[in-house]
């Protein structure tokens, strides 16, 4: 499996997540969520792994007006709007296959001592 870290270059939690994996010698791929973002399939997979779209949104972030709009539109429109505006998502998003976490959660990123290059993300 390949660890993917979605975040921004300026985000401290994203930097801490990168440092966490780097210090343990675990290979990962960094994807800038503003420049490239997640594909629709990746996005749906992360939403499903984290209890739905509502849990992915950083309601306390800088985009208050956009968050307010998202609260009142249909589910299909919410998905499209957040997919278009991925800066609304809690970051970093750390993916390993179908498993993922939102935010900096080193306690969830369990290391498999037999394979230093793989990480198991528990579903806590």
PLM segments and residue spans:
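Thiol/selenol-based redox catalytic cores and closely related redox-interacting motifs
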Residues: 33-124
């Amino acid at each position: 499996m390949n660890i993917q870290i979605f975040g921004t270059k300026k985000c401290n939690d994203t930097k801490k997540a990168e440092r966490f994996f780097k210090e343990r010698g675990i290979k990962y791929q960094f994807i800038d969520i503003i420049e490239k973002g997640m594909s629709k399939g990746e996005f749906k997979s992360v939403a499903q792994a984290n209890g739905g779209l509502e849990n992915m949104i950083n309601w306390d972030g800088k985009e208050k007006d956009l968050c307010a709009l998202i609260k009142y539109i249909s589910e299909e429109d919410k998905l499209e709007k957040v997919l278009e505006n991925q800066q609304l998502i809690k970051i970093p998003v750390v993916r390993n296959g179908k498993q993922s976490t939102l935010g900096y959660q080193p306690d969830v990123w369990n290391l498999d001592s037999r394979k230093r290059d793989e990480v198991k993300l528990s579903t806590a």
